[in-house]
Amino acid sequence: MSGAAEARQIALYEYQPGRGACYPADFLSGFHGYLQTDGYDGYNDVKGVTRLGCWAHLRRKFDEAVKALPKGARTGAAVTGQAYCTKLFMIERELQGLPPENRYEERLKREKPLLDEFRAWADARTVAPKSKLGQAFVYLANQWTPLTNYLLDGRLEISNNRAERSIKPFVMGRKNFLFANTPRGAQASAVIYSVMETAKANALDPYRYLLFLLEEFPNADRRRADWMEPFLPWNAPDDCR
């Protein structure tokens, strides 16, 4: 999924036969830029990218640690860690709408000290690594560099929630059509979802856009090098909106 700052949004689904590190490395071969993911280690072999972590995943782990507390308990390290994450998201909401350069500066001024304080506080704690709280601390320590790399550029986001949301339609659809019988079927589903979700991400009406493609695509002059340009979502006619 493209970053929120990109004018031309792309939601790209890709079927792979497994979750091994070779698949994202192959898929993203040649790409250079920022890559925001969860903490899955399979992305570690992707070359030429700057990894960004997801603060929503970390906050969720502290949320789980708070839920594991005895009934009525509202103090302790789990609550404090949760509060740090909540404060960070509150500041982010206040910075929404700022130009990237201003958001970059405000983050350094307001969020960098909070992050330094959070890390120092976490480093001073000793918790059982297999407990819910321990899992949150392990995630924080292992993912700290990706988690804080969003400070590098004001266009970047602190979570990959947008990508997570783009996955939801496919997950819901899969429950209805009960998976794919063959790899070719899975690949076809990935193509359809890529087209539809990219259309939605660019404020198009998916039905009207698909109708436009089905009616006009067969008549395209494929001898032209730029034959596909008129069909891209950002070049679609107004009646697709």
Predicted features by range, described:
Residues M1-R241:
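Catalytic center-proximal scaffold of phosphoryl-transfer enzymes
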